[in-house]
Amino acid sequence: MRRSPPKPWENNSGGGGSTSMTGSGGISRPMSGPQRTTSPGGGSSTTTQTSTLNNTGSPSTSVGGPLVTRPRTPMRPWESGGAGSSSIDSFGGGVGGSSGYRSSYGGGYRDSYSSGGYGSSGYGSSYGSGGSGGYGSSLYGGGGYSSGGYGGSGYGSSYGGGYGSSYGSGYGSSYGGSGYGSSYGGGYGSSYGGGYGGGYGGGYGQRGYDNMDGKGGALQSVVSSGHSWMEALHSIVDTFSRFSRLLDANFDAVHGSFSSIIRLCQSMSHFSYEIMAIIKTYSLFRMFQSVASRFLRVFRYLLGKKSKSNSSNNNTSSKFGSNAITESLRQANMDVSDFRNFQNEKKQSVGTLILIIAATFIGVPMVIGQLLNLRRRGQASRLDKGWEEQQGGGYGQVKAIYEFNPETTRDLPLRVGDIVNVIDKPHDNWWVGECNGLSGFFPVDFTEKISPNDINNNNNNNNNNNNNINTSVQIYDNNNGFNRNNSNNNLNNSEYSDYSSSNNNNNNNNNNNNNSNYQLQSNFSSNNDGISKNIIYNNNNDNQRPISPSKTSQQLSRSELMDKPYVEES
């Protein structure tokens, strides 16, 4: 790559001061970056400028200390509508003049042969399209061998083409390139490729030589090859799917045939079962027939009848050899009259046969039924005896000698003369017994042991209806002070008193008992620790009734008391 010629605004003539090359009406290039100033000795030194804008809009530059005002940028030709220069630079038209916003050999902002500002061949170039040239003029854009910018050769360029192109298409390209006006491909106005303004390569992102032919290049080839590969893969997958469907159909066919064979075997098994049932029925019929024939033979023998074979033999023998028999009997000096009398005997009546059949088919089952009933009665008696032994024989039986009114739901009520079957003896003073269909705990001191012989001599009346007990049952509630009095109740079996609060004192006084000469007074009180104690005061115990052993019972709460139903007995 050959070197680019020196730029006009950077030339130094013989080490003298920097010369600004501008033509008539030329525009000075804006100074950007470090500026070169000429030292008194002829050398150039680089100083940093500080640019500011004055009130008129022109930048001012401070070089080395004093403030230097930079000239105002003149109007551009496409902004003013006229030619801003009297001549066009060599090897291509710019905006005017030989330097500034134009370049030689296709320069853009400051390019030579390609480089990038706003685009090589940007605002007027040779050998490359103009970026934004006039509406078709060869002066302000385009010209030479390439197209103009907005219209380069659309509205007046040579060699025809799209909206302003030469030898190609696009919006203003040359030889097929894209962009706003490029030659030999390119981007926004570059020569020989390039992006937004690069030469021989990338600018803002173009691919350089890849887009020189105006086609997709490697990307298009990759896309096309990928498309072919996807089609091949799709065909392979479709083939496998068809093969899988074929295998599925074969599996269904094999499964159906196997199922049909299994159903056939099952049907054959049912058929063989039916055939065997028929054969069994026929064999049972034959067996029954043989047994019946033998049974009839036995009956015939018992009835004195001969079988058909014997009778036929007798008939034949009587026909063919009766005379011979008589002759032989005569020769043996035997009396034939007895034999003839036996033959002339009358046959037995049918009643005998009916009697035998009735005795066989009716009498025998009756006898068997009676035997079974006797066996059942024996088993029942043995079970009853074992139950009695289990209920009363294990621990024996006791007789109640005093009445016992249950104090809890687990107690067994007793009356004088009741026979109690002892079930268990969990404690020394309290046993578990059963009486009158009820079971529960009863005090041992209220009973006495008896022998089995004394049970039959018990003529006591268990329904002791002569006891007229006048009681008053009171239920106290702390919340609403409810008092309920039930008097003159005839209680035959039991008497219950419920206490709902740990702070209540319930006095159950049984003062009137016409049948006994004793008086039992019970005071139920509660202490502060919530444990109910049963304190029994025996004031008048005329008949020396023993007092039941003390039991510590848990006090019922109000909720438990309300849950229990209260039943009045009249």
From Swiss-Prot:
Bias (Basic and acidic residues): 560-570
Residue stretches of biased makeup (Gly residues): 13-26
CDD domains the record matches: SH3
Sorted UniProt keywords: Membrane, Peroxisome, Protein transport, SH3 domain, Translocation, Transmembrane, Transmembrane helix, Transport
GO BP, one annotated term: cellular component assembly
Transmembrane segments: 349-369
SH3 domain span: 393-452
Pfam family for this entry, one: SH3_1
Region named Disordered: 1-91, 453-570
Bilayer topology: Single-pass membrane protein
Function: Component of the PEX13-PEX14 docking complex, a translocon channel that specifically mediates the import of peroxisomal cargo proteins bound to PEX5 receptor. The PEX13-PEX14 docking complex forms a large import pore which can be opened to a diameter of about 9 nm. Mechanistically, PEX5 receptor along with cargo proteins associates with the PEX14 subunit of the PEX13-PEX14 docking complex in the cytosol, leading to the insertion of the receptor into the organelle membrane with the concomitant translocation of the cargo into the peroxisome matrix.
Binding partners and assembly: Interacts with PEX14; forming the PEX13-PEX14 docking complex.
Family statement drawn from the similarity comment of this UniProt entry: Belongs to the peroxin-13 family.
Protein name: Peroxisomal membrane protein PEX13
Gene name per UniProt: pex13
